[in-house]
């Protein structure tokens, strides 16, 4: 059925993206990062794997162990730090990332806990971050700097009462959420745009059945993160468990600096 709110949200995201692209073309940038993994290869130096994360023979990046996914925490990151803002100018990067993933439930197990695309100061998995902490938050620390988009499959006491997509900043109590009608085993395609001019993080999620979910939130990256961040995915389980597999991932950022001499354009990848 026609949903005017969804159409409006998509148009707003497209307008935001083209404004972002026009701005990037007008100015010089030499601090952009761009990569595109249409699949993954074992031993690829472009990806750092931590915890139970592994690359399977079929080119899929598994964040949990397919043989024994109980009490798993897996993290996969782009291997190099990504400049996200510049102290000399105060400028903040804009970026776009697209990825596709599958969540596979396990017969007889409670489906939990979820997967997060994130930007964070460090590569390592935080201590005390199993299960509902999604491998991103140390439950014993009052402050955990990160920005992320979570795909949460289990309702903890701080969560909405169903599976959901959320935008997070330094807390798993999401700034904004939308219900996620997850279908086990189906491919989910995600595009995320951060527009530094409006400080808006926008997300479009397309499901295999054609359903589209959108969510957006103002997030000040400079207020949360240092000048360089690590970018990637994290997933965690306990006795409640699922399989979390990344099929493809692209990322492009543009950061204007005082000494820039070249320009990098941004693009949204699509996956068949």
From Swiss-Prot:
Glycosylation annotated at which residues?
36, 39, 65
Q: What is this protein called?
A: Putative bark agglutinin LECRPA3
Q: Which residues bind Ca(2+)?
A: 152, 154, 156, 159
In the record, the note on similarity to other proteins reads: Belongs to the leguminous lectin family.
Q: What residue ranges carry the coiled-coil annotation?
A: none
> What is the annotated quaternary arrangement, including any partners?
Homotetramer.
What keyword terms does UniProt attach to this protein? Calcium, Glycoprotein, Lectin, Manganese, Metal-binding, Signal
Record function comment: Bark lectins are storage proteins that probably maintain stocks of nitrogen during dormant period. Self-aggregatable molecules that can bind their own carbohydrate side chains. They could also play a role in the plant's defense against phytophagous invertebrates or herbivorous higher animals.
Pfam families hit by this protein: Lectin_legB (PF00139)
Its tissue distribution reads: Weak expression in bark. The lectin accumulates in the inner bark in autumn.
Where does the record locate the signal sequence feature?
Answer: 1-29
Q: Name the positions where Mn(2+) binds.
A: 150, 152, 159, 164
Q: Which organism is it from?
A: Robinia pseudoacacia
Which domain of life does the UniProt lineage start with?
Eukaryota
């Amino acid at each position: 059925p026609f949903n005017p709110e969804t159409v409006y949200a998509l148009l707003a995201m497209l307008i935001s993206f083209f404004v972002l692209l026009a701005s990037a073309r007008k100015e010089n940038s030499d601090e952009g990062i761009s990569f595109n993994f249409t699949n993954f290869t074992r031993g690829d130096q472009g990806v750092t794997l931590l915890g139970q994360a592994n690359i399977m023979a079929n080119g899929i990046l598994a964040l949990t162990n397919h043989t024994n996914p109980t009490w798993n925490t897996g993290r996969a990151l782009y291997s190099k730090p990504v400049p996200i803002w510049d102290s000399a100018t105060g400028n903040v990067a804009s970026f776009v990332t697209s990825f596709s993933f599958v969540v596979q439930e396990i017969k007889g197990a409670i489906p939990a806990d979820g997967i997060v695309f994130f930007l964070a100061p460090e590569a390592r998995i935080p201590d005390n971050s199993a299960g509902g902490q999604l491998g991103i938050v140390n439950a014993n620390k009052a402050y955990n700097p990160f920005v992320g988009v979570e795909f949460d499959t289990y309702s903890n006491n701080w969560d909405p009462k169903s599976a959901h997509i959320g935008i997070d900043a330094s807390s798993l109590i999401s700034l904004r959420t939308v219900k996620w009608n997850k279908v086990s085993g189906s491919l989910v395609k995600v595009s995320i745009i951060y527009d530094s001019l409006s400080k808006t993080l926008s997300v479009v999620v397309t499901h295999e059945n054609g359903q589209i979910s959108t969510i957006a939130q103002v997030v000040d990256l400079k207020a949360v993160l240092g000048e360089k961040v690590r970018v990637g995915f994290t997933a965690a389980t306990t006795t409640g468990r699922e399989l979390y597999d990344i099929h493809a991932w692209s990322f492009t950022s543009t950061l204007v600096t005082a000494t820039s001499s070249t320009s990098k354009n941004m693009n949204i990848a699509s996956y068949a």
